[in-house]
Amino acid sequence: MKLFFRFLTLVAVLAMSLADVAPAWALTSRIKDIASLQAGRDNQLIGYGLIVGLQGTGDGFRASPFTEQSMRAMLQNLGISTQGGQSNAKNTAAVMVTANLPPFASPGSRIDVTVSSLGDATSLRGGTLVMTSLSGADGQIYAVAQGAAIVTGFQAQGQAATVTEGVTTAGRVPGGAIIERELPSRFKDSVNLVLQLRNPDFSTAIRIADIVNGYASARFGGPVAEAKDSQEVVIQKPRTADLTRLMADIENLIVETDTPAKVVINERTGTIVIGSDVRVSPVAVSYGTLTVQVTETPQIIQPEPFSQGRTAVQPQTDIAAEQTGGRVAIIDGPDLRTLVAGLNNIGVKPDGIIAILQGIKSAGALQAELVLQ
């Protein structure tokens, strides 16, 4: 058994921050890539269904009685009597079926659906989803799903061992749902177009409004866009404009984007994402790792032959401690490359980098928002 004790020591924090920092390189994007139309949002659909054809990996009727009830109801709807019969076959599983209904979807088009086990099924691999209606938040049925479930994980089981890779109790049915009802849309009758930024930012919203007004002034003779806040830009429809063509022209306009500096840390997976606008004031960091390994090797002591002694177990414990690292690295530079190079010079793993970044933020030397997930 290994116990890891990691400590972080900030040796010194230089008080002077970097003054004249050069602006970050500009990133340009199309409006369609950074904003979405408010009237064109997705809608969520949900349904309850059955997956059949499983090879003994479905729900047990004792642990999941709702699966048996659903199967009996389905067979009765098909005109098959289920009186007096009881099945112990585990080839059926109850699942929740979810999907996203895209905007402006028309009847007859197909969408992907996700199936997730509700009972004690161990795998949905090889199963087929039978006809399942998908409803929206208003209770109306908008699509019907059916098809073979695709499961990426697998499971192999024997009498004494089980091997599982990935998730076997959830999967997808590509193109498994047919849209039967379209959402009521008033896009053509709209007076205003509302663009919503995927990453809210006042600077980007103002730039979008300026770019759209420049296009509208040249095309229609006046400005039409106004930045409402950091997330929404409202565009008034010109009288002579066709709304579909207007949106097609606007979404292809190029705008310079800007986002706040962030460092995103996922402590569970050790993932660290550092934005290009992150700035670090000069700071010196030392990081060390203390590893303590405890090994138990019990010894079995046998009694002498023909004696009345008993076999005994004598514990034996070996403890070894090792300390690595401890070097001091000075991070002195305004850009992301300097920060990454300084952390790599210390030679630490991702969990150590997480601790260092938290320490730098606490010292006031990290000029960015630290987001912990």
Curated annotation (Swiss-Prot):
Q: Where in the cell is it found?
A: Periplasm; Bacterial flagellum basal body
Which InterPro entries does the annotation name?
Answer: Flag_FlgI
**One GO cellular component from the entry?**
bacterial-type flagellum basal body, distal rod, P ring
Kindly state which keywords UniProt assigns to this record, in alphabetical order: Bacterial flagellum, Periplasm, Signal
A Pfam match is: FlgI
A Gene Ontology annotation in the biological process aspect, one of them, is:
bacterial-type flagellum-dependent cell motility
Q: What start and end residues bound the annotated signal peptide?
A: 1-26
What Gene Ontology terms describe what this protein does at the molecular function level?
A: structural molecule activity
Family according to the record:
Belongs to the FlgI family.
Matching NCBIfam families = PRK05303.1
User: Quaternary state and partners of this protein?
Assistant: The basal body constitutes a major portion of the flagellar organelle and consists of four rings (L,P,S, and M) mounted on a central rod.
Q: What does this protein do?
A: Assembles around the rod to form the L-ring and probably protects the motor/basal body from shearing forces during rotation.
Protein name as it appears in the record: Flagellar P-ring protein
Organism whose genome encodes this protein: Rhizobium leguminosarum bv. trifolii (strain WSM2304)
